[in-house]
């Protein structure tokens, strides 16, 4: 079943130019966007002061002098639409940028994956909300039909989600004909004919309509109703992810950048889904003011123990890292770059989940701990080529390279699960060492000698020993020519 989603951003000119929410909440008179000296759209505070679309600049200044007036910025709107399209790639690789702040997404093959159309629409709205945009959503079997339904006024009593072609025709028939861009130049002529809806427009003789209005109007009608093929220019996914976002105001604290970071992370997740990649490392730059006292960007480099593509995990790590950053200057822009990516591994085919979580789950936990506590405070053990048990390993940060792992001795006797920080001297009872009870040797001696090269020379004979309760210990006899009596030590406990 072919289902295309129409996504219209009715406030886009205002969203890319409006002042920060804190200014509006402080009681400002609001903001209005002008195009050629005429109000295109105004926010709620400006409307409360009487500002309406279509008013001229002079009328606005007379009615509400405190209203902030900004010129429409088509370049910023185009950038915002591309950012939304990039984020929507997580739902489908087929995303098209259309006219009048509207996007078309082919979600037919993705419906089952996202739990059906209602669930998919909820997830799309959540993605758009994370980007800071409100939207009107529609669904139809044709792209132009979805576009028309999404562009319908919020006050119109029209069903915006239509799955069957037959239902689409009946729904489109009720829409005003001037909603179709190709019909707007002829709005006066059509109104004079009493032609107000798309049904009225389709009822006109096609030959006469083509002579009067040209072939483009009929072609647009046919594409909307599914009577003609409609070519859609799907977005090309960029080969690399490197996105910069300017902040609406100067930010003095690192954690205040999180909202902007989320907008970039949402786009990153869409890009990863479209490219079928997982992220192994990324760089998040905080750009400061330029000029005579310019400060280089504050760069946060994040590397992951295992490649990931989870938005929540990215945000947790960024939040922990930003909480520990002291800014040298105010932030005016942020930039996110995927520096290392890997192909997505196929899902595991295990019937039952792995006890204790998967390798990816554990890796995410370690990354979160490193971000919160600092990389130098979360360590892992690495083997060292040394026969002495107390020197056979070292502690390294999680992301440190340990080099080639040291190989243990071939056919080495069993080693205890727990090694004491310092060997514990044992008392003697007769010829047997005692730890709670006399110990009985259960293995032959394993001689370990080394350390002459660093001044920590040891010479020991290790044994596995049992006490009377059956507990298992790792003990050694110190080999020393100067000792008058044998000296035994406890060095490890078996589990």
Features from the language model and the residues they span:
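A residue-level signal for conserved active-site and pocket-lining positions in enzyme catalytic cores
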Residues: 60, 101, 137, 201, ...
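Structured, non-catalytic alpha/beta "coupling" segments that mediate domain-domain communication
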Residues: 87, 119-160, 216-224
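A glycine-rich phosphate-binding loop feature that marks nucleotide/adenosyl-phosphate handling sites
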Residues: 140-148, 278-290, 331-342, 380-395
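Mature hydrolase/peptidase catalytic cores and their serpin-fold inhibitory cores, especially
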Residues: 350-495
């Amino acid at each position: 079943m072919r289902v295309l989603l129409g996504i219209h951003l009715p406030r886009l000119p205002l969203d890319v130019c409006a002042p920060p929410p804190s200014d509006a909440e402080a009681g400002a008179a609001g903001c209005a966007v002008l195009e050629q000296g005429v109000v295109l759209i105004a926010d709620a505070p400006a409307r409360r002061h009487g500002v309406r679309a279509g008013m001229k600049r002079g009328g606005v200044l007379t009615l509400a002098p405190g209203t902030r007036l900004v010129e429409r910025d088509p370049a910023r709107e185009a950038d915002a639409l591309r950012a939304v399209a990039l984020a929507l790639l997580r739902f489908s690789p087929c995303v098209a940028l259309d006219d009048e702040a509207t996007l078309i997404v082919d979600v037919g093959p993705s419906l089952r994956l996202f739990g059906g159309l209602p669930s998919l629409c909820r997830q799309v709205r959540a993605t758009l909300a994370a980007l800071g945009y409100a939207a009107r959503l529609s669904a139809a079997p044709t792209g132009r039909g979805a576009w028309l339904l999404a562009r319908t006024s919020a006050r119109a009593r029209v069903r915006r989600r239509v799955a069957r072609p037959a239902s689409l025709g009946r729904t489109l028939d009720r829409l005003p004909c001037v909603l179709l861009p190709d019909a707007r130049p002829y709005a006066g002529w059509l109104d004079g004919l009493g032609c107000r809806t798309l049904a009225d427009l389709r009822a006109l003789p096609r030959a006469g309509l083509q002579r009067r209005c040209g072939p483009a109007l009929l072609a647009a009608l046919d594409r909307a109703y599914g009577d003609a093929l409609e070519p859609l220019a799907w977005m090309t996914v960029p080969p690399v992810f490197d996105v910069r976002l300017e902040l609406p105001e100067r930010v003095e604290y690192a954690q205040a950048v999180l909202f902007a970071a989320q907008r970039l992370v949402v786009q990153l997740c869409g890009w990863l889904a479209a490219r079928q990649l997982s992220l192994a490392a990324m760089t998040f730059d905080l750009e400061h003011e330029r000029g005579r006292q310019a400060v280089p960007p504050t760069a946060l480099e994040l590397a992951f123990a295992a490649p990931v593509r989870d938005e929540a995990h990215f945000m947790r790590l960024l939040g922990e890292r930003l909480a520990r950053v002291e800014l040298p200057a105010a932030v005016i822009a942020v930039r996110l770059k995927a520096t290392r990516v890997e192909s997505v591994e196929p899902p595991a085919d295990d019937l039952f989940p792995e006890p204790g979580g998967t390798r990816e789950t554990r890796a995410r936990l370690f990354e979160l701990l490193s971000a919160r506590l600092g990389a130098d405070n979360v360590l892992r053990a690495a083997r060292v080529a040394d026969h002495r048990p107390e020197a056979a390993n070292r502690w390294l940060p999680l992301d440190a390279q340990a080099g080639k792992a040291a190989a243990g001795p071939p056919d080495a006797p069993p080693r205890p699960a727990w090694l004491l920080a310092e060997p514990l001297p044992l008392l003697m009872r007769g010829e047997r060492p005692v730890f709670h009870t006399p110990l009985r040797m259960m293995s032959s001696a394993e001689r370990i000698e080394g350390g002459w090269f660093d001044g920590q020379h040891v010479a020991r004979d290790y044994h596995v020993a049992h006490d009377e309760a059956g507990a298992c210990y790792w003990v050694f006899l110190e080999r020393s020519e100067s000792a008058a009596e044998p000296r035994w030590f406890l060095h490890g406990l078996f589990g």
